[in-house]
Amino acid sequence: MSVSAFNRRWAAVILEALTRHGVRHICIAPGSRSTPLTLAAAENSAFIHHTHFDERGLGHLALGLAKVSKQPVAVIVTSGTAVANLYPALIEAGLTGEKLILLTADRPPELIDCGANQAIRQPGMFASHPTHSISLPRPTQDIPARWLVSTIDHALGTLHAGGVHINCPFAEPLYGEMDDTGISWQQRLGDWWQDDKPWLREAPRRESEKQRDWFFWRQKRGVVVAGRMSAEEGKKVALWAQTLGWPLIGDVLSQTGQPLPCADLWLGNAKATSELQQAQIVVQLGSSLTGKRLLQWQASCEPEEYWIVDDIEGRLDPAHHRGRRLIANIADWLELHPAEKRQPWCVEIPRLAEQAMQAVIARRDAFGEAQLAHRISDYLPEQGQLFVGNSLVVRLIDALSQLPAGYPVYSNRGASGIDGLLSTAAGAQRASGKPTLAIVGDLSALYDLNALALLRQVSAPLVLIVVNNNGGQIFSLLPTPKSERERFYLMPQNVHFEHAAAMFELKYHRPQNWQELETTLVDAWRTPTTTVIEMVVNDTDGAQTLQQLLAQVSHL
């Protein structure tokens, strides 16, 4: 009997089972203990293979692939700290709903807690963050293949969102020629190998039902808050709110077109919040709200009813409103709850939104971070997509820009970390095949710098704009102690990215004005390669411009 051959047959069952649940993309890091999984994946023609040498980046690459494809994505890593590097992407997926299948190779039980190399306690290491965790036994023919495949099917068949951790111990030898070991064990699955259905098919969960009193509530004064959703859902939500005559407060990730732009500015005006107090119901569609003023209003508003509609399970309301938590696909929910044509009830807010946008436009000529955020809608590629980083840049775009309705926007706004942003953007581009504009800050780019290796392989033009404000300038917006702000919060690195781009053979530009930036973008969208654009700005201008606009709009 060949141990290495049976390891591979065991792994082949696991990988084939994944294909029955829509897994097409599989991300693989180098490693020896994961050899059975890697070779099984390589031999399965159903998979599109992605590789990366950094497991943390690999996890985020998978996250980006899952965001855009809307399908589960598998990841294969070796044992030890390689597994731990998947934690940030797993956490993000749990909060934003992407399906990640983590196949982590492991040492067999007799090598754990005895000083063996690269052997750590992997089962349960991700605590409650995976939706499902499976600790498989060492491969053995004493366990029927139908147990293995049905175990995988149960986890994936009941997976609505988030990650699945499948820990896979393998004993040595890991290498060797294939023989007939385990063939009869595999063949007991019969014609499953020629089928395309799961061995075990589980009925999907019930969706949220229609609210029977909707016909009553849609006649009231309502407010629509739009959080993270798909591009198609964004367009439908905008039309739905317009028909109802309800003001729509759209987040940067809502893709609604933000018909009342600059919400994070005008929500700081007492006239706006006073008018919103008249709302009898608030319907929030999608979660992960960005703007500080929006979050403050959301926490303080007291309508008769507060409904939150999102496909992700959980409470999703840090303000703990009295109301309803409705778990449903947003587009499906809108169909069940049609709008009735009514006249808009808000008068002040549309006027304030227009005045806020005019105040932003009046400042658009300076070459700075806030101005880039406002102008970003002018720089989007046709039939493309936008990936927005975290920290200051996403807040500036949320507050100062008006993105087109239905234009795809992606970001990691679950845990809102700055780790893995470039890797996630790479995954988003690969899954869509679309021209992609990604914008991040300098610290975010440094954090995931080796992901530039992933950006060498793109199928359409990708432009990465690194806004270099020399540190974490979001802390300029917070009451951090001035005496310690630079050393312990901003942490300026005084670096530029020309040599980093050169190391990975990526095109690089550092424009000095808007004309140079726009010329660079025109050229970049012509070729299916990556272009790194470093926009060096005055360190505090972005935060100061936002604060000045907030003060100005609050007194309108």
Curated annotation (Swiss-Prot):
Molecular function as annotated in GO: 2-succinyl-5-enolpyruvyl-6-hydroxy-3-cyclohexene-1-carboxylic-acid synthase activity; magnesium ion binding; manganese ion binding; thiamine pyrophosphate binding
Keyword terms of this UniProt record: Magnesium, Manganese, Menaquinone biosynthesis, Metal-binding, Thiamine pyrophosphate, Transferase
EC numbers, comma separated: 2.2.1.9
Co-factor remark: Binds 1 thiamine pyrophosphate per subunit.
Reaction(s) catalysed by this chain's protein: isochorismate + 2-oxoglutarate + H(+) = 5-enolpyruvoyl-6-hydroxy-2-succinyl-cyclohex-3-ene-1-carboxylate + CO2
Official protein name in the record: 2-succinyl-5-enolpyruvyl-6-hydroxy-3-cyclohexene-1-carboxylate synthase
A Gene Ontology BP annotation from the UniProt entry: menaquinone biosynthetic process
Pathway: Quinol/quinone metabolism; 1,4-dihydroxy-2-naphthoate biosynthesis; 1,4-dihydroxy-2-naphthoate from chorismate: step 2/7; Quinol/quinone metabolism; menaquinone biosynthesis
Cofactor(s) of this protein: Mg(2+); Mn(2+); thiamine diphosphate
Family to which the UniProt record says this protein belongs: Belongs to the TPP enzyme family. MenD subfamily.
Record keyword Metal-binding present: yes
Subunit details: Homodimer.
Matching InterPro entries: MenaQ_synth_MenD (IPR004433), MenD_middle (IPR032264), THDP-binding (IPR029061), Thiamin_PyroP_enz_TPP-bd_dom (IPR012001), TPP_enzyme_TPP-bd (IPR011766)
Function, as annotated: Catalyzes the thiamine diphosphate-dependent decarboxylation of 2-oxoglutarate and the subsequent addition of the resulting succinic semialdehyde-thiamine pyrophosphate anion to isochorismate to yield 2-succinyl-5-enolpyruvyl-6-hydroxy-3-cyclohexene-1-carboxylate (SEPHCHC).
